[in-house]
From Swiss-Prot:
HAMAP family: Pro_tRNA_synth_type1 (MF_01569). It is found in: Cytoplasm. Homodimer. This is Proline--tRNA ligase. CDD domains: ProRS-INS, ProRS_anticodon_short, ProRS_core_prok. It is an enzyme of class 6 (ligase). It catalyses: tRNA(Pro) + L-proline + ATP = L-prolyl-tRNA(Pro) + AMP + diphosphate. Its EC number is 6.1.1.15. InterPro entries: aa-tRNA-synt_IIb, aa-tRNA-synth_II, aa-tRNA-synth_II/BPL/LPL, Anticodon-bd, Anticodon-bd_dom_sf, Pro-tRNA-ligase_IIa, Pro-tRNA-synth_IIa_bac-type, Pro-tRNA-Synthase_IIa_type1. The gene is proS. GO terms for biological process: prolyl-tRNA aminoacylation. It comes from Microcystis aeruginosa (strain NIES-843 / IAM M-2473). GO terms for molecular function: aminoacyl-tRNA deacylase activity; ATP binding; proline-tRNA ligase activity.
Amino acid sequence: MRLSQQLFVTLREDPAEAEIPSHKCLVRAGYIRRIGSGIYAYLPLMWRVLQKVSQIVREEMNKAGAQECLLPQLQPAELWQESGRWDTYTKAEGIMFALTDRQNRELGLGPTHEEVITAVARDLIRSYRQLPVNLYQIQTKFRDEIRPRFGLMRGREFIMKDAYSFNLDEECLKKTYQAMDIAYRNIFRRCGLAFRAVEADSGAIGGSASQEFMVLADAGEDEVLFTADEKYAANVEKAVSLPADKVASPFKKFAKKETPNTNTIESLAKFLDCAATAIVKNVLYEVVYDSGITVLVLVSIRGDQEVNEVKLQNELVRQASRYNAKTILALKIPDAAAQQKWATKPLPLGYIGPDLEDNLLKKASDIAPQFLRIADNTVTDLENLITGANETGFHLVGANWGKDFILPELIVDLRKAQVGDRAIHDPNQTLQSARGIEVGHIFQLGYKYSQAMNAFYTNEAGESTPICMGCYGIGVSRLAQAAVEQSYDKDGIIWPVAIAPYQAIVVIPNLADAEQVKTAESLYNELNQAGIETLLDDRDERAGVKFKDADLIGIPYRIVTGKSLKSGKVELVERASKKASEVAINEVVSYLKTAISKVNASD
């Protein structure tokens, strides 16, 4: 392709809306253009990158036995109501674009396709002889993000590969899941990315197990906790660890103590001259279920720990049936104003104890009559503990479970793992932290959707059995930007060879020099004929502008038909290393073929 004929506009200044380097680079280099909040046009160079990523994805999915299809973007609300996710996606999380057609039917623009594909399977899969089967698509998805940002990282419209497997049973699912794990690792390696596979929370998708694939980058939105021995890695939302050893309480007798101005753990520990590990803090949450019931949740956790609200949300979803509900619509820590809806009197925030009385809750049909009390594992073995006295300015000391108040029946791991914690698999290993960009996620869904939507098959014994499902996603457009976030410098993008829009660019420094033009045209044709995708910068611009643009757009190899022509050579510059070499004109093709094959082999 000749740059003089391409829609190609670069910017010298960073765009005002761009916050992270990859976003700045892609806009400045003319790859993407903002159309609206979280909405971008993929310009010709970007489209070539996306096609290359998609092709690598397609090849590895096909090799793993998956079959490509295309599902509708418009999805009937009825399917999502069958699965129980319509309210979650349109009200609780509010990420689905929902609309009503002229027949007054509700529809959603697909953020994901579990319901649609399950409906297809329900209609078409009848016998065990048809299983397992794995279907995938590459298409545009839609999410009504609260705060679209970072370009293609968190947009309202994005390209994704999503696959869905239908399996005989859990054992069969594990085999497919493993095949997808291998395929994903191959995809990310071939794309030239440094990545880490980590344990992950399944979120609104659901399922028994899931794993994320993180591209390591300082600007990553996710925190990954891992050990140096490479035997453990997890998203902080999912991570588990051993808490720090507790320090014994200095109080041996039960007493109520006046503790003015101690509504934080730090101030209380300082006032009482005790360790935070001897304190039980009680965190109050307000949760609204899709049945319309508001439940007040009291979480008791050790003073030196923080509540992992993702773990808490998952536990509250598991408790939904107690309140004739399927999911939660909202979860928050209530402030004084919010309490007026359900509290008979203001609560002593900062001084709450685990025995906060239920009669503080107003009697109303939409308010649960009792607190849902949950204890984190860290508090169960504490003795002579310190906690709130349910009175502003007072705490209890020397208290014990079973004697001074009842230990909640619901005991769950709700603590947030932290850097420096000891690892469960080896206490000699401590958790370290890195930032990551999630580019892939695989789930063992199990029977969640097949049972909810009545997708059954007949097994060998003639019995009707729910299909065991898995789902597997890759953010194609996000992956492309993540590659930039991982590999750039002050001059612009450094594309991995495998997904670069072009592998080489031939630059003519001076269009008035007939020899430069002739040699460039010849090399341009030879390289393309040899299968090396090559750009020709034949624009009527100064040489400095062309060199800057070549660096900015990140083409892996730059060939310059300049002063070296006098000795029958051209200058060849590697974008990644900036190493410049003089190569004989008749050796350029073989030189680049060798260089590219070495890079591809290492990936």
